[in-house]
Each structure stands twice: as C-alpha cells, then as structure tokens.
C-alpha cells in the first residue's frame, strides 16, 4: 500500500515551517504526494509571492541534498517551480547548491549546468517556464548562468523559450525577450511549432518592437516560412487592423521582397491575405513597398482584387480602386476568365451594395464560357451558385482556422445589414440592367 505525505506535514511544507522536519526520522525524499511532489515542490508551489527568506529551502537541502534533483510525476524538479512562480532568490540558492557539487568526470558538465538543462515530461527547461510566465529576473539569472553554451532547445510542442516569450502579452514580456537576446552568445534558436519562428509569433500579436529586435539579430527571418508556407508578413497581413499596420511596415522595411513569397498550397501572398481580411491599409503599404507583387496570382489565377470581392466588403473594394496599382487589376482574369467584376455580378444578385459597385464600375469582358458580367448578373442560378461557391473557397488562416474571412452570420447582424441596405437603396437611386 502506497503511503503519502501526512496532511499535517503537508501543511507545514506549504507554510515553510522547518521545525517539524528538523528531527524527522524518515528520509525527506520519501515524503511524497500522489503526484510525487516533495516538500520542496509543495512549498514552492504554494508561494504566491517571492519568499522573503530562503531559510526553508536552505535548511531542507542541508538535511536532504537529493531533493535538489528529485522530480515529480511530471518530471519537474524544484528549479522548474521556482522559475514558474518567479522566485528568483530561490533560483539562486538552487543553482549555488548545484555548483557546490563535483563536476561529472565523464561528461565534464557541472551539476549546475545539468540542472539548468533538465526537462520535464513536455521537455520544458526552467527557462521555458520562466519565459512562459514572464519572469524576467529569473530569465536573466538562467541565461547568464548557462551562457555561452545554452542551446535554447525546443520542447515537445516545438516551442523555444524565445518563441514562447514572443507569443505572449503581459508585464515583463519585453524584458524577458531582451534578456534572452542579450545573453545568448551562441546560436540562438528562434523556432516554434509547425515551422513558425519567434518573428511569426511577434507578427501575430502585432509587436513591431520585438519584430525589429529579432530582425536586427537575424534579418533572414523575413523569408522563413512555416509548414504551410506562410512568412511572417503573411501573419502580419492577417492580424493587422485598419489602424495598426506597424509590423507590416517593419517587415517590409527590412525586406520588401518578402511580399513575393507565396504559400505552399493555394499560392497566396501576403497581399492576398490582407485583401481577404479587408485590411486595406496593409494592402497600401505592401504595394507601395513592392509594386510588382500585385502581378502575383493564386492557384486559381485570382489577384488581390478577386480576394477583396471574396471578403464581401464593398467599402474596401471601393478604397482599393482608388489605388492605381490595384485599380489595374479589375480587368485581370483568373483561370476561368473571370475578372473581379464577374464575381461581383454574382454577389449583386443578392446584395444591393454590390449591385451599386457593379453599375459604377463599367468593366466589360467575357470569361471562358463566353459569359459577360451582364450575362452572369442576368444568368441562371447554376452559374451564380458556381461563383458564390468559389468565393467561399478562400482557404485557411494560421493556427488551423477554417475560414479566413469573418462573415456576419447571426440573425441580428443579418437584420441590421438588410435594414442598412434598404435605407441606402431608398436614399440613393440605383440603375438596373434590364434582364433579357
């Protein structure tokens, strides 16, 4: 029968009372909880604030030195918990205790180095824990102790400490990133899950300052793509807003040619991604920095203006037509011979706002079925449905999102939209093409 830590002793461990353990007859490393936490794990996990004194930790390790390296069921040693909860003074004590031990004669690695690199069941080191929880003081201690050899290896999820820090928000985050960048003398690992890098992460959260710091260290990160072929610029284009395109600007400042990078499957560039998201300011910045990228089309022959139509946002489409480089795309045909206005003709059947765009555009041309824009508008349901289905097939976003474009689907938004269309149609006359 398994015997677990006595509840009274557990409480003393939580509170950091050494006296009950001072003359305890059983070895302290045999006092375990069901998760195999030792009294040090219990103590460190219970401290919501950094302990003012390291007395309890010092005295326990004096009495039972093996506890320094003893792991719980998750493979966590006391250093993992001290790093997670930001107990920098305890981290120093643990490292000093490890330094006092003799170096392994075979490997030549000191016990302190060995402890710093120990991983839990998810392959997280103490540095991973400190970075994830934004413990800048702990990160400073850990990175300085293990340089210049520190490898910054990835955990089972492919996350390096730098990637974890770049992915998060909150206080101390910038200091964590600065400490890692400053104290890494050897090769720095920027990697993250699914081929992403810390620059992808910074782009996703809209952090232009971190993006600039990373590029100052490693400029080629602008061309590093994830497993789907998305560059950091793809992420910045996707996550930018009408008001904030700061990361897009930084990435293009360092490497405007990143706008030429097309993803693996659908061959969409960052301009396509900005278009489907309706991020017109990001589109303006991309075409101003790399004008020729407008010529790139996806695997269906769609240019950026086709994607703006797929975004279903008339105001964005009108704004794009005011940009000369994008306005020229309105007559360009895809692999089926459809211009962006052929797509609009299908939408105009069910949406008065698109009907207004259609009749103001005055674009002509036949697709490969010999159908003009007027033919599609006046066509049968099958022709219209085929185009509407193509507008739905715009691919996936990052992190496995099923759709890129976010549409108004709930009943409340639908009613508001119908009311707006009705109001605008009453206030602004719209010409109608006579159906044949």
Placement of each model-derived feature along the sequence:
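Regulatory and partner-binding modules of innate immune sensors/adaptors
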Residues: 1-436
